[in-house]
Amino acid sequence: MQFPQETKEGVIFIDFLEFTPKVSWQNMSDAQYKVNRKDYSLVSDFVSYRNTTPQVKKIITAEDQQIKIIADRLTTWYLGSGQQSSDKWIKMREDNEEVFIRTGLKAAQKIKIQYNEDNTPKAEPLFPMGAPTTIEGQQLKKFRTINENILLPLALDYRKNHNVQSLKKVLYIYDWFNDQGWADGSGMGTLCFEKLRSSGYFHSFFLLKEQLSPELLERELQTLNWFTMFGTCYQTPANAGEVADNLRALAIPKLIYALSINDKQKKQVALTAFKNYMDNALGIAPGFFGTLKPDFSGYHHRGPYNSAYYPHALYAGALIAYLLHDTPYALSESTLHNLKQSLLTFRFFCAGLNVPAGTVGRFPKGQQILETLLPAFAYVSLSYKKPDKELTAAFKRILESGSNRQAITNYVSNVNSNLAYTSTVGEIELLTQLASTSISKEEKVNGTLFLSLIHI
């Protein structure tokens, strides 16, 4: 057990001590073991990532305005354009976002802003995902609960409704999190999956970072660097590909980290490293590695996983492509091609909105998924100089099918910040933007496609 680098002494408080004959590798502190594997496996080497020197072979330089374009696109994706729209789906998303905010504010009422004399938060202990639900009959409060249900609604309430009390509560929660171990270099026992259930923290940070003091901003940036594993971007991997979990949950948070660095040169280094990382992550992965395969199917857990993981990773990759397009940090033409062909292939092997039953992994009831990729079609199509005709035509056939209307409506109505936060107003605005183009929908897809890496 080590004190923080800037501290020579202190007091350790133990909230819960458990003696157990067996500890799952998923529940042990990632800082305690040495990772011998060099591939992109599920065993993340947090300490190696943290200690990697922030450098790249060739820095891609950019003007402040060019970087601002990326940040502005991301902000608009979160908050919407602010323009009045009569579109029913935009209105539906806005209405359900309001419900999401109100629900979060109600849950946040139980959190009282209180500090001790030493300026530490006066609050109950917080526990990671791997901790028991109760101890001696007492319900435990976990980081994940606040991450998923409270942080993002508060941040949206401040940005959209200018509620200063919501801002104050988020800043208090950041202090509370930090006091309980949510910090740079902290293991908390479950980093393996804690990082995947932290979307509320990541996205609230971007929305509120301009309101943070310089000291608080620096503290949270270091925390963000740790939990997003941004250090992977500075490393040179042995092969193309990336774990779908790390794409769907951490691709946008990695970009948030890079955009939030104040020093101009360091920001350019980080954005260059991120662009290189994403180009490699969305490359064609060999063998059983994730995620994109040579036949433009997708792997996770060393096999096809079309009900989850893979489509989520496609979504994240497509969104990154849109945010970076037409800037010095735009993803490569090869990466755009991979995303385009992967989306077209996904729609080809779907029956209606359903993926083949033999490719659903451990989610037998998760066949219906194609409607959740409609925004990804829009992101990639709009990343070209002109909307891509093939993607747009495929998108419109799915969108305009009467049999798909209810599923699409359900998707638009659902707003949450679970594993990955995607249910934004900006998402639906881009979807409707592509829908309004003059490109006609494609005919019903037919023919034969040989997918050598999917065995049904």
What do the PLM-derived regions correspond to, one by one?
Residues P21-D30:
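Short, charged low-complexity linker/loop segments at the C-terminal edge of domains
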